[in-house]
Amino acid sequence: MDYKEEQKQELEVLESIYPDELRIINDEYPKIKFEVAIKLELDTGDSTSVLTKEHTIIAEFKLPENYPDEPCLISLEAQEVALNDNEEDNEEDEDEVEYDDHGNKVLKKFENLPDLISFKGYLPELTVQLESQIETDMLLGMQMCFALISSIKERCEQWYSEQLNKLEKQYELEAQEREKKEQAKFHGTKVTRESYLEWRSKFRQELKLDERDQVRRMKAHHGKLTGKQMFEQGVVGTGDEYMEEDDASVDDVAKGLAKTEIANQ
């Protein structure tokens, strides 16, 4: 196989297919090197979100001396270009990022989900997939750059759709959780007899209501305990002492009545 001629022919074919996207870095064999700007056609599906960025994958190809019997070397780079003047809005949104109790970013209602997707993290995985494809599809021995360029575009667009779907599901779950928390504010704790008595006991202890009631009763009885209070508090000699006091009171009354009768005579 004439490797030089094979590579020259493939480069000419690619120039005709990608007249605006292809840029030749070196066209001298055996160090042919070029890059292709692959514009992705992304779709938000049924989502109400809109695309505010244009995503392009820059694929750089280096052709070894024995290409295509040896695989080409591929380097990938992701580029993002704003479609509208949204840069100032995006900067303001960054200041309003919120996180949950576990440190995960919370998706807000006003947040545009497609803007959260970046291809930079996917490119290492994509590079491995392309290397595997060369072997799986048995591309060695034939011109493979066009097939790989097409695969890059297809895989990236598929990956984007999957990521957007995940974000939408995550947003729905978070929206449901927020709704539950909002609804919980309007539902108080169910009160049972046991919970009420427990609350009442703590409440009276905190405000010392029982002590206040006791002081109030003492004042009502001129500082003396009632018989019930003395019995409950275990005052010693309650019965005998009060019996003696009662007997003394009866004697005093009797003496008073006797004096009154003598005086009247």
UniProtKB/Swiss-Prot annotation:
Top-rank taxon, per record: Eukaryota
UniProt subunit comment: Interacts with GCN1; this interaction prevents the interaction of GCN1 with GCN2 protein kinase and GCN2 activation in amino acid-starved cells. Interacts with RBG1. Associates with ribosomes; the association occurs in a GCN1-dependent manner.
GO BP: cellular response to amino acid starvation; cytoplasmic translation; negative regulation of protein phosphorylation; negative regulation of protein-containing complex assembly; positive regulation of cellular response to amino acid starvation
Name of the protein this chain belongs to: Protein GIR2
Pfam families: RWD
Keyword Cell inner membrane: no
InterPro entries: GIR2-like, RWD_dom, UBQ-conjugating_enzyme/RWD
UniProt function note: Acts as a negative regulator of the GCN2 kinase activity by disrupting the GCN1-GCN2 interaction in amino acid-starved cells.
Residue intervals of the RWD domain: 9-159
Family annotation (PROSITE patterns): RWD
Anything else known: Present with 10300 molecules/cell in log phase SD medium.
Keyword field: Repressor, Stress response
GO molecular function annotation: protein kinase inhibitor activity
Keyword match Protease: no
GO CC annotations on file: cytoplasm
Family annotation (CDD domains): RWD_ScGIR2-like
Gene name, Swiss-Prot/TrEMBL: GIR2
SMART domains (alphabetical): RWD (SM00591)
Family to which this protein belongs: Belongs to the RWDD1/GIR2 family.
